[in-house]
Every structure is written in C-alpha cells, then in structure tokens.
Amino acid sequence: MESEQLFHRGYYRNSYNSITSASSDEELLDGAGVIMDFQTSEDDNLLDGDTAVGTHYTMTNGGSINSSTHLLDLLDEPIPGVGTYDDFHTIDWVREKCKDRERHRRINSKKKESAWEMTKSLYDAWSGWLVVTLTGLASGALAGLIDIAADWMTDLKEGICLSALWYNHEQCCWGSNETTFEERDKCPQWKTWAELIIGQAEGPGSYIMNYIMYIFWALSFAFLAVSLVKVFAPYACGSGIPEIKTILSGFIIRGYLGKWTLMIKTITLVLAVASGLSLGKEGPLVHVACCCGNIFSYLFPKYSTNEAKKREVLSAASAAGVSVAFGAPIGGVLFSLEEVSYYFPLKTLWRSFFAALVAAFVLRSINPFGNSRLVLFYVEYHTPWYLFELFPFILLGVFGGLWGAFFIRANIAWCRRRKSTKFGKYPVLEVIIVAAITAVIAFPNPYTRLNTSELIKELFTDCGPLESSSLCDYRNDMNASKIVDDIPDRPAGVGVYSAIWQLCLALIFKIIMTVFTFGIKVPSGLFIPSMAIGAIAGRIVGIAVEQLAYFHHDWFIFKEWCEVGADCITPGLYAMVGAAACLGGVTRMTVSLVVIVFELTGGLEYIVPLMAAVMTSKWVGDAFGREGIYEAHIRLNGYPFLDAKEEFTHTTLAADVMRPRRNDPPLAVLTQDNMTVDDIENMINETSYNGFPVIMSKESQRLVGFALRRDLTIAIESARKKQEGIVGSSRVCFAQHTPSLPAESPRPLKLRSILDMSPFTVTDHTPMEIVVDIFRKLGLRQCLVTHNGRLLGIITKKDILRHMAQTANQDPASIMFN
C-alpha cells in the first residue's frame, strides 16, 4: 500500500496552483529543517519542493513535459521498498504529506460504501487521539516508576529500612511514633550502614563507614548504568533532547526511539540519578516519552507508514515528557513548541495538550512523592514582592546568563576534547572517575550529599514555624506568642551563616562537576543541575537582601514598604527566580520556562520577576553567543540541522554556492531515454550521491525531473526479478512515451513512476538569503539550479551549512558529521 501511495505522491501536482488547493493550510508544509544523509559525500538526499514565489526564482515542472497529461506510467505492480528510508537519511516531507493527503482522500471516498469502511474511517480519524492517549499513559506511569525507584536507591546509599526494605528513608519513618520534631528523620526502623556493619550510630568510626558505603554505592550504581548503556543501548546515554530536535526536523536514526533504548534508558536513568552525579532526570524523561510515542505509533497504519505524521506524535510525546518531569502540562506544550518541534500544526498543539494532560493525571494518581504534587519541590509563597526587588532579580538574571555562556563554552570544549583524544575511548572509566570525584567531595557537605531535587526543595521552601533546616536558624528576638504563617524578618543565626558557607562551596562544586558530567555515557539531564546552581545563588542573594532590609529598614529603599516586624523578603522566592534564570541561560528558553516555573509555584503573582530574570539571562547569554546548549551539541555532533533561529544576512547568490564549481567534475545526471540499465548501475556504483537529476539530453540540458538513488536501486532489482527480458543492455526510459527501438533490442525498462516530476528549482541569480529561507520553511534537502530551464547545478543542505560556516569564519569540516 505504501508503494501505491508513493505512486500518487503528487506527480499530478502540475503547477503551484494544484498545491495551493490542498485540503488544509498545514498540508502546504511548514516543513522541518530536514537533515542530510550523514554517510553520503556530495549530492545528498533530495527533496521535491512544491512552491516557489518571488521574482528571482521559479518553479519548473520538468522542462517541456506536457503537464496536462497523465504523468505516471505505472508498473504492473507496486515496487516494495520504494518510498522508505535508510538509517541516517532524511525524510521527504513533501512526499510524506502527499501520501497522507492521498490516503485521506481514499478513505473519505470509500466510507459511504459500507459500514465497515465507515468504521475504518472513524478509526483513522480517532487514531491520532488514541496514540497520544497511550503515550500519555505510558509516560506518566514510567515517570512515576522512575521517581519512586530513584528516591529509594538514593537513600540506599545512606542506609536501609529494616521493617520494609522497599521503603525509602522518609516512608520508613512515617509510621514511627519515636521521631522527634528536631530529628524527624531519625527512627529505630531506619538503620545507617555504620549501625548495621559496626554497630555505631555516632562517632568518627561511624562517619568513616558511612562515607565508604556512600562512595561504594555511588560507584556501583554508576558502573552498572554505564555498563548497561554500553552493552545494550548506546543511544540511551545523554539527555536525548539534541537528537530529538534533529529527529523532529526530519532525520532518521534507527533505534534511537526503540524498545531497547526505552528499557535501558528507564533503568539506567534511575541508577544515574541515584549515583549522586550532577545530573537530572527531566531531560531524559522527554526521550523516554518520545520512545513511548514512537513505539505506540507503530500500532496505527496512519503513523507507522508515514514519517511526517509520526513526528506529530513525537511532538506531543515531548510535551508529555516535560509535563511529568515538572508537573507542568501547559509548560510542556510550550516547551515542545518553543524548543524541540520544527513542524507544529494546530492539531498537534491540541494533541500535545491532551497528551500532557493524560500524563500529568497518571502521575498524580501514582503520587510518587506522597505530597499530592507532581514534583518534589512544589512550593507556595504568600508574601508579595516589591518594586525594589526587581533589581536583585535582574542581577540573578545576569548571573544566569553568565553561567549559561560559561557552561556552554566549557562543556562543548570538554566534549570536543573527549571526541578528539584517547580519553573518549574509555567511557566506563570516565564515568567511574567522575562518580568517584563527585561522591568523595559531595559527602562531607550536607547540601551536596542531598539528592539534587531535595536540595532544590529545601532552597525553594520558605522558613515557617515548622522548618528545622539550618537555613531557617534565625534568632528569635520577637516575643511570638502564637504560630503564624508569616514569620517576620529576623536576624540570621549561626546556622544560617554556616549554611551560607556550605552553599557557597556547594555552588562551586556544582558548577565544576556539571561541566564534566553533562555528556558522559549515562542518561544525564541538565534541567535540575542548572536549577540547583541558580537556586543556591538565589537563596544566598535572598538571605543577603533579607538581612539588609532587617538591619537597615530605615533606608529609603526599604522605608516605604518594609516595617520593623514585617515579613518583607522571601529568600525562597529568590531561589526560584535564580533557578529559572540559570536554566534560561543554558537553554535560552523564555516563554515555556516562565510557565513551567509558574506551574511549579502555583502563583500568578511572581510571573513578572520570573519574566524579568529569564529575559535578562537570555540577553546576557546571547551577548556571548546565540546558541543554547542543545543547539551547541547538535553542531558539535555534526548533525546537519538548519536552525530556524539563525539569521543569514550575506549577499551571495545561488550560483556562488551551487556545485559543481569551477575545476569540479561535471554534475552526475541521467538522460530520459539514452541510458541502459548497466549505465545507471555503473553510475550508482561509482558515485555516492543520493539522487540524480534527469535531463532530456546531454546537449539540451533541459531538466525533466529527479530520481533518488534508493528508488533506482530498488526498482532495477525488482524489475530483474519480476519482469522478463530486462537485462544489462535494456534501455531505461524516464519519458512518457518509449522511443522506437530496433526489433532485436531487449525489452526497455520504464521507470517514469519513480521519477519526481517537480523537483524544486531556483535560478542562478536567486539570493542565498531567500534560498536559505526556502530550505527552512519547506524542509528541503536540496534544490536544483537552472538558467533559462537548463540545468546548471545543485545546492544541498550540506552546501548551505558549509557556506554559513564559511561566512561565520568557521572551518566547514569541523561542523559536518564524520
């Protein structure tokens, strides 16, 4: 059926007008940045385009072909495999959209024939909602499982619950009647490793034994994680978001979203988080959700046979991933729209919203943290913010931008060094070394020993009457006779100053270790470490402003709104703003990030501080480089990804960029009726191009169409097996009518059915600024360059990327995938 759809792929599109009459606007193709084949050298994968407007370029339709006639000369039966894609190749967005339109028309035309056809039509219409529902259910369930397992294994580094081995520390002490307010985390049921092994709960011996066991478990978890990744699913490492962006732009990476990757990523994500490495599970949860979406899409023919439609499901899945990662369904939809998706029609927006809703509902039903919230660090603030506080909020934004710029440069430099040195050949050793250093340094400091999510929770939490943290060790010089929600600002006690020093050390530790951790061969997210760094900085700034307001409340900046005994400053709010600023500085997200953090806090009142800090961090970060961390890793890995956010302002023409250039060999082309099967097979074997222009003759150079290498190979192999008389000397005919041949000639092979009759073309005088825009908007892989209808050359996406690198004074070879 797929091949049959391919035959109707839109070769009836005899003019631009036939495209503009498509069934819906989105089908006109807001294409994605389609990627080139990694393994080909020059004329890479080709994509037929549909539209061309403007004065400098034109849309051709196969030279002198009579476009009013039936353009297809179908073979006796469909050719299996034509229209499918190899690994590390780019999908043909236009062909996939045409296949879907043809499928839709065929179903609509048959649905009135019988009740069965009507049922099939309804099933087809609802399959999109069904697949995103299944994706949301699976994403929510897996996220709950990962949260519960990671919490239990994190606490396993410190001790074990004897009454119920599957309880973490907090759950173990829930049912105990022997806990005190000051030591609420201590109960007889929970035993540290020192108590179990040497029978001591206190003292130097106990500390050393707990230290050793902490390092042992951290190294064990890290070693198991990297070993599973290396042996079973190499694609399970890293964040996954750069590759998800690349896949959503049209690239195919077989196995990246497969069942083995899903299984290993889920298991190793728990191990990596529990090992105490400076990483988070939020980014990899997007990869896990996309794996679920990809697997479920194979249950529905509408998506399993159409790569463009499948990417709509993956966009919805990425929204579900962020929804369960942060408990932010709306933020997840905006994240998918702003950060990862390239092609995002309106119906995908609705389905993304629904997938995020279902995933959040499932996670809420599981209640992994026991607090009836979707995340561990949900907080609510009751104190309003004041205009003066915008100044420290903006300073936090500047810090976030500087941190983001530093992190991107340092991490990319380290990852590049890893690729270019022998160190990168020993991923297991690297993970063990990083885990060992992290564990040895982290244990003595209570803030780095904490699970990062718990650290963020503690930094976000406002100091209330029931808080026993050292961050809330203020001197009570007020005669408070009753417990109230809003405790007035007080002078900091010894515990607060001690905590600030520990937080400063934790900040330095987190900054250094995150640079070296992101990119190692275990699942590693960046959201939580970045938020932790910002939250530490924000809490420190918040305490400083709070003490300034307490001791100098008569200053004019405090005098109007901060009275003695009032609760003016909320340090936890500063931590939240700092977390958003640092995450924005690294990823360069804006709208989606503000909404995610707003959904975390449940307070509309703090949107303005968040917006101010996030925008400031983006501006400061952009001053050092416009790329976020994910775009930087895409460029580092050499994925030919044409970023829609980049601007092209140079005044070159298509003729300056096209190949062949001067001193290059001539362009490899096919003629419409002068070549034999052997000629074509020799050309395929001698070149590595992914397709060949078809011209009328070598003399005229008039363009007829374009034939893909894969389609030619499959069609010739199929013809040799199924059609009698096809031999090496058989004439291959791409023309509408077979030319007259001598009687003794072997049977000709008619391949007009695999010919793209409307390849996208531009003239040699088209400005490159327009060509780049066309590639982005239509998701093209290449276009042909003509002059008065005569073929001159070809421009591929790799040519554009090389040209953009040269104009930016970069080495083109350094950005292309090897």
From Swiss-Prot:
Motif position, Selectivity filter part_3: 525-529
Intramembrane segments: 241-248, 313-325, 329-337, 572-586, 590-601, 602-605
Placement of sequence motif Selectivity filter part_1: 238-242
Membrane association type: Multi-pass membrane protein
Site, as annotated: Mediates proton transfer from the protein to the inner aqueous phase: E339
Compartment(s) where it occurs, according to its Swiss-Prot or TrEMBL record: Early endosome membrane; Late endosome membrane; Lysosome membrane; Cell membrane
Cross-referenced Pfam families: CBS, Voltage_CLC
Superkingdom of source: Eukaryota
Gene Ontology MF term list: antiporter activity; ATP binding; chloride:proton antiporter activity; PDZ domain binding; voltage-gated chloride channel activity
The keyword Transmembrane belongs to this UniProt entry's keyword annotation: yes
Glycan attachment sites: N177, N451, N479
Keyword Lipid metabolism: no
Post-translational modifications reported in the UniProt record: N-glycosylated.
Residue intervals on the Cytoplasmic side: 1-125, 625-818
Cross-referenced PANTHER family: CHLORIDE CHANNEL PROTEIN, H(+)_CL(-) EXCHANGE TRANSPORTER 3
Function of the molecule: Strongly outwardly rectifying, electrogenic H(+)/Cl(-)exchanger which mediates the exchange of chloride ions against protons. The CLC channel family contains both chloride channels and proton-coupled anion transporters that exchange chloride or another anion for protons. The presence of conserved gating glutamate residues is typical for family members that function as antiporters.
Subunit note: Monomer and homodimer. Forms heterodimers with CLCN4.
Descriptive protein name: H(+)/Cl(-) exchange transporter 3
Organism: Cavia porcellus (Guinea pig)
